[in-house]
Amino acid sequence: MEFSGKTAFVTGAANGIGLGICRALARNGVNIVLADIERAQLEIARGELATFNVRTHAIEVDVSDAAAFDRAADQAEAEFGNIHFLFNNAGVTLGAMPLWEMTPAQWDWIFGVNVQGVINGIRTLVPRMRSHGEAGDVVNTASIGGLQVNPKLRNGSYAMTKYAIVALSEALALDLEGSAIGASVLCPALVNTTLHASSRRRPTRLGGPYERPGADAAKAWQSAGLSPDEVGMRVLDAVAASEFFIFTHEEPRLWIERRHARIIAGFDSIERYNAGGRTT
């Protein structure tokens, strides 16, 4: 996969993994459209990337807003022409909370950003990427939590949205077979980002910014994570190698193997049941 001279559209680009991806893209000569809901941070990120010999353009956008995403895509094409890479990276979390305690507005927010935001990116930009026929890739950011629900974190709503992104990415890869566009899903484990501060990015229509309980503890925990720059380099290496699942850590392999063992045990159970080994 060639990178230099092409253009990428990155959501959640103002900080964290999104900015790490942008830095890796810039080092590889890719022009970048930075999309994020935080205008001030967006301009800081754009200013930093100006030190690289690439073109950049910043767009303030709420990815959960379909019409706003359409306008952002139009603006990106007007500025750069063809888009080759789409990184659907924007995401939020509510932290640990029993599912039954979540309000409709909280469900709307986390689903709107984490799932509908990715859908909006695919719906808006993939047809344009396919139409020009040049090689590219779509990378959707899920999480290792999109393959197993962490029993310690108890962030079921977040995991639910990330499971959805894994399935969405698998379906997208099938839909894109035979085209010049690939698809990948990024499943990072612990990364040093500002995901813990998602609450400051909640839009007014869903209640506005708020102070999330436990945010300080989450910040301390996340600070021990992998750097976003390392994630960015890993992502581009995987895209160049046409990898579908993009992992950032080796340790979660055991967690996933244990989960799959429970799934296989379920099939063993139905096999015994059908063979007459019933318990009732």
Residue ranges and their predicted role:
Residues N28-I44:
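Conserved glycine-rich Rossmann-like NAD(P)H-binding loop of the short-chain dehydrogenase/reductase
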Residues M97-L99, Q106-D108:
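Substrate-binding pocket helix/loop in short-chain dehydrogenase/reductase
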Residues G178-I246:
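SDR active-site lid
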Residues E2-V33:
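Canonical Rossmann dinucleotide-binding motif of NAD(H)/NADP(H)-dependent dehydrogenases/reductases
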Residues S143:
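Residue(s) in the substrate-gating loop at a strand-loop-helix junction
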Residues I122, T161:
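Active-site helix of classical SDR
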Residues R39-A40, I59-R71, P104:
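The beta1-alpha1 cofactor-binding region of Rossmann-like NAD(H)/NADP(H)-dependent oxidoreductases
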